Amino acid sequence: MWIYEGKEFLEEHVPEDGFGFIYEMAAIVDGKSVRYIGKKNFFADVKTKLAKKDMPTDKRLKTYTRKRKFTYQNYFSSNEVLKTAHKDGVVIKREIVRICKSKTELSYWETKLQFVYGVLESDEFLNGNILGKFYNIK
């Protein structure tokens, strides 16, 4: 269950102009409190091959792009520690920190919050890098 502004976040709460969200996950793994800050898209563009009967007269166009909803309800982070903890039955608190309207805004807020919380300096956070440029110094 995702929490946003103190309430359960359901699919009908996804805004029309929403692109994705920034989340914070928290759990107790092996007796230690851990947290993770990340981002997740509501939708993805998926390229699909056209069937022969659907091909236009211009044969160069062989694929089309469609939007696909992500199943964020069942998402438990890209972090392996949290994925394993979830499979082992550990309760993970999943909170949406901010909903963003564009890819740029999503990356900006993820990066900003990771620096503000000091995820690379703190042992409590599981984040190993920020933007793939700044790495864990623990």
What does each of the following model-derived ranges do?
Residues M1-D17, I92, V97-K138:
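Boundary/linker segments flanking structured domains
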Residues M1-K49, K138:
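GIY-YIG nuclease catalytic motif and its immediate N-terminal context
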Residues W2, K7, F21, V34, ...:
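Intrinsically disordered, low-complexity segments enriched in small/polar residues
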Residues G31, K40-N41, S78-N79, N127-F134:
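Glycine-centered flexibility motif
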Residues K40-K103:
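Conserved short loop/helix modules at catalytic or binding sites
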